[in-house]
Amino acid sequence: MKTRQNKYSIRKFSVGASSILIAALLFMGGGSAQAAEQQQDKGTVENSTTQSIGDGNEKLSEQQSTQNKNVNEKSNVNSITENESLHNETPKNEDLIQQQKDSQNDNKSESVVEQNKENGAFVQNHSEEKPQQEQVELEKHASENNQTLHSKAAQSNEDVKTKPSQLDNTAAKQEDSQKENLSKQDTQSSKTTDLLRATAQNQSKDSQSTEEINKEVNNDTQQVTAKNDDAKVESFNLNSKEEPLKVDKQANPTTDKDKSSKNDKGSQDGLANLESNAVATTNKQSKQQVSEKNEDQTNKSAKQKQYKNNDPIILVHGFNGFTDDINPSVLTHYWGGDKMNIRQDLEENGYEAYEASISAFGSNYDRAVELYYYIKGGRVDYGAAHAAKYGHERYGKTYEGVYKDWKPGQKIHLVGHSMGGQTIRQLEELLRHGNPEEVEYQKQHGGEISPLYQGGHDNMVSSITTLGTPHNGTHASDLLGNEAIVRQLAYDVGKMYGNKDSRVDFGLEHWGLKQKPNESYIQYVKRVQNSKLWKSKDSGLHDLTRDGATDLNRKTSLNPNIVYKTYTGESTHKTLAGKQKADLNMFLPFTITGNLIGKAKEKEWRENDGLVSVISSQHPFNQKYVEATDKNQKGVWQVTPTKHDWDHVDFVGQDSTDTKRTRDELQQFWHGLAEDLVQSEQLTSTNK
């Protein structure tokens, strides 16, 4: 019996020594963590928040490692002592020993949870606790652990002394103890979960606050670190350098502190122990979300589309043409009809192109001015002299501008269909030579004058391409367009759609054909009846006549720096009488005008596309021309071969009933035209 008492004394001594060792190591861990905290506090405000999290985690890892190591040592000592004391006891005694170990592990878990709570508070308070407070807390927990170990050791020794007859009662007590321990673990797990949620919310708030500071300062660089191991700790490094936001090239970069922790076996054991007890050190998920957002924002780069053409392509519609936002519902899409969207198809195939939106019934002069402001941007100024001469308002609608930097040296390609070909010729003339009448009027009356009328704006157009354009006018306008009944019908339609509730815009608002907000429709009709438009030559119907076209030809000239090209179609066949008759596949509304032109007195004018004679579409009579070849030329009209069985709208695909003209054929035509425009830039580029 004395020998057993001596062994019991040695056991008490070893347990006490272990407790002292645990307390000493805890003090050392706390001192190390405090030293790290004091060193980190020297940084900026942003760094202090992030570094305190790292210090808290490092402290937790060291304490867990120390506790795990000492508990293992204690367990080994107890195991040796118990083996010497019990020797070959019954299996029930072995179960008793195992129960003691489980109880010790529970105490260890309680200690870890308590330490975790301290670290949570440590993180939330941004490392502002004093070293003395930490030491008091550590001493308190060390004392509790020491008392627990003594009590367990004493209980174990007394149980060993107990006679075998008392083992049954001990087993029953052990079962009760197990139930209590399980209940404690559930309670601790619940508390730990609540603690983690609170810690995660605080850390998320800290992260958001840090991001707001970073946005205000605009000088911080975030370096985001992430690890795939769920037990690892993510960290943010906020540097006060005046550099843009950067993300490390490595997917999962690690700091020196992480590397040292990785190599520390004790830290790994502590983290593993925390995992087994459902205890986490940081809210990793919230930081991963921030990391992903930062990486997405950093890696975003503005995509600058590269076009095949250096100079944008501007598509200019003809008489009675509209863009989709202002056209009557009975009309199809102008550029492509139901077959395709020409502008969109060009864009998808690498060509920058735009659809101009100008007056449907206006004169070439007014349309050219509108086209200038459509490209350049601004409020349309028809000119003081021009407005006074024809009796309409000086100013029109305001355009945003599709090419605001348009100026000499910054060129464009102008492609006009039908009357649009005349309009783009008028615009180029105004750019180069301006309007002498406007210049003189401004000298006499003062006021402002648009730069367009001052002239001297050469090298702004790379090429001029016309499709079925009546360069020399058309018999259709001579015979029908200027008849009183036809003119009245056309303008009545414009007047009807000019009411304030209509979205349709014929481009005659400067003539007063737009109902005012406080004006009744009856008042609007009476006012419009007195408009000078009905007898004016400043209209599209006049400019399409042979006289109107001849007047334009006299006022315009070829620019030696521009590539000119014309495309012509015909959709009539010769009869036995020598006249031209509309083909069966001609667009139905054009059969009347096509047959009318086919009966013209001048035989050379009879072949036509339904609206325009072939001879008028090829080139202006008073200007130089050549047959087009594979090699482009400047300063001369290049006439392409006439396209047979192509009527006036086949160039823009508006006839959906024409089975001969397919979508693929239309697409091929426009792709070839666009490629030709790109080739012409080699001749007209000012950067050679």
From Swiss-Prot:
Stretch list, region Disordered: 31-309
Record InterPro entries: AB_hydrolase_fold, Lip-like_C, YSIRK_signal_dom
The entry's keywords: Calcium, Hydrolase, Lipid degradation, Lipid metabolism, Metal-binding, Secreted, Signal, Zymogen
Catalytic residue positions: S418 (nucleophile), D609 (charge relay system), H648 (charge relay system)
Primary location class: secreted
Low complexity bias (residue ranges): 68-79
Pfam families the UniProt entry points to: Lip_C, YSIRK_signal
GO molecular function, one term: triacylglycerol lipase activity
Cellular localization per UniProt: Secreted
Record flagged with keyword Calcium: yes
Positions of the propeptide segment: 36-302
Catalysed conversion reaction: a triacylglycerol + H2O = a diacylglycerol + a fatty acid + H(+)
Ranges in coiled-coil conformation: none
EC number: 3.1.1.3
Alphabetical GO biological process terms: lipid catabolic process
Extent of Basic and acidic residues compositional bias: 84-95, 103-117, 126-143, 173-183, 240-267
Residues involved in Ca(2+) binding: D647, D650, D655, D658
Signal peptide: 1-35
Domain of life: Bacteria
Statement: the UniProt record of this protein carries the keyword Metal-binding: yes
PANTHER family: ALPHA/BETA-HYDROLASES SUPERFAMILY PROTEIN, ALPHA_BETA-HYDROLASES SUPERFAMILY PROTEIN
Family: Belongs to the AB hydrolase superfamily. Lipase family.
Protein name: Lipase
Organism field: Staphylococcus epidermidis
